[in-house]
Amino acid sequence: MKFNILNLLSITLVSFLMSCAGSEPTDVQVEDPAIEVEVEVAEAPIDDIFYQVPSPNDLFNVLKDADISYNKEILNDLSRVESLNSKKAKALNFGVYAADLAYVSSLGQIGDASPIFETIRSLSKELEIENAMNDVIYSRIQDNLDASNPDSLFSLSNETYYKAYAYLDNNDRGDVLGMIVVGGWVEGLNIILNCQDYNDSSEVVQRIADQRLTLENLLVFASRIQNEDLDNIIAELAPVEELYNGLVVTEDSDFTTDESEDGVVVFGGGSTVSFSEEDFNNLKSIVAEIRASIIDGTL
């Protein structure tokens, strides 16, 4: 089944939450971000509208402006790749390493980016998706590694991720695509949950809370791929879904719409999400457990 990355509906799903609170747990009230939707009237039935799947870079944009210290210990050990024996394990961990590359690039750690890039390149060959990233892409990435250009590398890591996405989409390999997306999302969420303690005013924490929307998006995407292995992987995300579904959401009656000059309709308002330190810590524990089963190849 085909999944068009740049189809009719593009949903901007960003905003997360986290940092350090005092002895009394507090709830952070987070407004759902505006949703920007490009509307093309009567072009296709609903079944042909596919949600855009986020790349790991979407999570880490906030780190570039936040006062976040780099923590290499968060990354997946590159030596683990040698023990990955199944297509499922390799695809999930391709996503994991793609998220790691986005993280180190976002914080300008060029020295750690190069070996991660080589690991991704190796996995792409084993998954038979090396054609998704031709020699021009590899050369551009290597040039930016050599020039210590983190901003361009961050952009290229995003491009590489979507090149793999498009290649798998166009070649009817939705199972591998779904696994890569899940692996990248779980690793990205684990990283951002561990980059600082809970703080009810942190923009990073805001990102974490808003991942409830990204998860909904991911589940819709995965549900369109008929594959038993992927279904089993998605089932492991049930505790994360349950936690997000348990958050208190207050609907905002002030809902607005506007249209930009280029025809993009922007929906404002929406709802407010309460995300406490307890929610944060529970999510951190759940995600760490899922991530552990991915990187050791047992999921």
Where are these regions (language model features)?
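Acidic/histidine-rich, surface-exposed loop or edge segments in extracytoplasmic proteins
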Residues: 76-83, 95-103, 216-223, 264-274
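Extended amphipathic alpha-helical interaction segments
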Residues: 150-237
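N-terminal Sec/ER secretory leader and immediately downstream segment
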Residues: 30-143
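A cross-kingdom marker for long, charged
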Residues: 221-299
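Bacterial N-terminal signal peptides that target proteins for export
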Residues: 1-9
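Bacterial signal peptide processing site
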Residues: 21-24
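C-terminal motif of bacterial Sec signal peptides marking the signal peptidase cleavage site
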Residues: 16-19
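Short, solvent-exposed segments of well-ordered alpha helices
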Residues: 81-88, 92, 107, 144-151, ...
